[in-house]
Amino acid sequence: MFLHPSYRNNLFSTKCGTCDLDAKVEFRSGTVTFYRNKNGSIYNFCSFECMDKFNRTKICWFCSYHSDLVSCESGFMICTSDTYWKYSCRDKYYIRLKHDLILEDDPLTDDDYDKISESDSLPDEYKEYVVKHDSDNSDNDSDNSDNDSNNSDNDSNNSDSDSDNSNDPNNFDNPDDNPK
């Protein structure tokens, strides 16, 4: 990348963009203008933690746009601006959330979002982006829910003794396990 000589002195600021400590060259982030293809600003940071905090709170997680931001459930900011493009990052995020697709990346194009949003179910070609959940634990939890409700009376009667004898090897949570 060619830089005009006047930028060389101002490219690296000496203060962290988050906490005003001395910045390091290896921790650098930037924002873009509303066209999303031009640099808006370059920020330097003292640590990865400061850079991550900036990236999660001051710019859009996906496109680095620095305005029209809202927070999302995943712990980062996304932009709501759709003035110059069909889908905002917020729209894309919620389409992916609805179809259980990967949230922290945006591997799809606008045409892909058209196909996904038009269909009620997710087309097969996008199944590779589905977030995998641990189905074994959810099956076990549903199987054990009946046992938990049956033992709730026993648990409430023995709640005082459970806290006192939690490390006692003779303490049995299940009455059927008690040796006779």
Curated annotation (Swiss-Prot):
Q: Where is the composition biased (Acidic residues)?
A: 137-146
In residue numbers, the region (Disordered) covers 114-180
Q: Where is the composition biased (Low complexity)?
A: 147-173
* Compositional bias ranges of the Basic and acidic residues kind: 114-136
Q: What is this protein called?
A: Uncharacterized protein R890
